[in-house]
A protein has these predicted regions:
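N-terminal strand-loop-strand
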Residues: 1-21, 49, 53, 81-82
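The catalytic Nudix box helix
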Residues: 22-55, 78
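Generic C-terminal helix-cap and adjacent flexible tail
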Residues: 121-126
Length: 126
């Protein structure tokens, strides 16, 4: 969070293609959650952040029309402190920007993204 706004990206690939979400991705072998967050934010937005503590965790399981599992992710969202940079989309992000909690109402986002952002808002500004 920065100035009562949260960094969001418009996803360019599944899961959540076309939806706004917090930046994220896979944890590489030997990488901590904090290191993964810092790397993914840098890759997707160009921003430098310092990851802090987890605020939300959930399973994301997507199935095809026949009920076969297409994706199963364990998602852990962390708070992060902004260090420097301007949002610029890269990697699998189509857009990247700082968004106020009020403006989020007008953006397409998943239920879980909205829940994560509610928890972040309740924790207060950073």
């Amino acid at each position: 969070m920065r100035n009562h706004k949260v960094l969001l990206v418009k996803r360019g690939r599944p899961p959540g293609e076309g939806l706004w979400a917090v930046p994220g991705g896979r944890v590489k072998l030997g990488e901590t959650l904090q290191e993964a967050v810092e790397r993914e934010v840098r890759e997707e937005t160009g921003l430098i952040v310092r990851a802090r503590n987890p605020v939300y965790a959930f399973d994301l399981i997507e199935r095809d029309e026949e009920g076969r599992i297409q994706y199963h992710y364990v998602v852990v969202d962390l708070l992060a402190d902004y260090i420097k940079g301007q949002p610029s989309p890269d990697d699998d992000a189509l857009e990247a920007r700082w968004v106020s909690f009020e403006a989020l109402r007008d953006l397409p986002a998943s239920r879980t993204t909205r829940e994560v952002l509610r928890k972040m808002r309740d924790l207060g500004p950073t």
